[in-house]
Amino acid sequence: MGVRECPALLLLLSLLLPPLGLPALGAPPRLICDSRVLERYILEAREAENVTMGCAEGCSFGENVTVPDTKVNFYSWKRMEVEQQAVEVWQGLALLSEAILQGQALLANSSQPSETLRLHVDKAVSSLRSLTSLLRALGAQKEAISPPDAASAAPLRTFAVDTLCKLFRIYSNFLRGKLKLYTGEACRRGDR
């Protein structure tokens, strides 16, 4: 018995899945366009930043971790092609994911890592994976792979951090800045 033969079952599933927090069948893959979704990730990043602010012991990496520069020149950003914005966001997200994973490994190798720190780093790893999936559904990866003029694309600006606090500050700033600007514009365009 297929789905076409049982429309009542399909209707029942489409009514039950959303209240459970599961995507409904045929639901558009634009979850990131719901501002509450991105705000949840931003809130988690800020919580992690706040937890690590007062941390001295166990928060230093002992080596530098490369992160994307989160500064945004709004005039330049508005004039940038959406494909170039996607490249910056995608590269920044990849670099942040790498940095958080590196931080996770360094934390695991420390003598006595705090359970709270480990929890926030693990949450960040999970959140970055989810954000990557949400951006894929929005089409950011496709835009980032084929920018109109790849030769003229400026390299991603980066710098190094040596503490969890600085890493989480960059993570929070990236989500509130470039990622939020890009998703807002991509969702407004609505041609996905």
Swiss-Prot record:
Belongs to the EPO/TPO family. Glycans are attached at residues 50, 64, 109. Gene3D superfamilies: 1.20.1250.10. Keywords: Disulfide bond, Erythrocyte maturation, Glycoprotein, Hormone, Secreted, Signal. Its main location: secreted. It is found in: Secreted. GO terms for cellular component: extracellular space. Residues 1-26 form the signal peptide. This is Erythropoietin. It holds the Pfam family EPO_TPO. GO terms for biological process: erythrocyte differentiation; erythrocyte maturation; erythropoietin-mediated signaling pathway; positive regulation of cell population proliferation; positive regulation of Ras protein signal transduction. Disulfide bonds join 33-187, 55-59. It comes from the Eukaryota. PANTHER family: ERYTHROPOIETIN. GO terms for molecular function: cytokine activity; erythropoietin receptor binding; hormone activity; protein kinase activator activity.
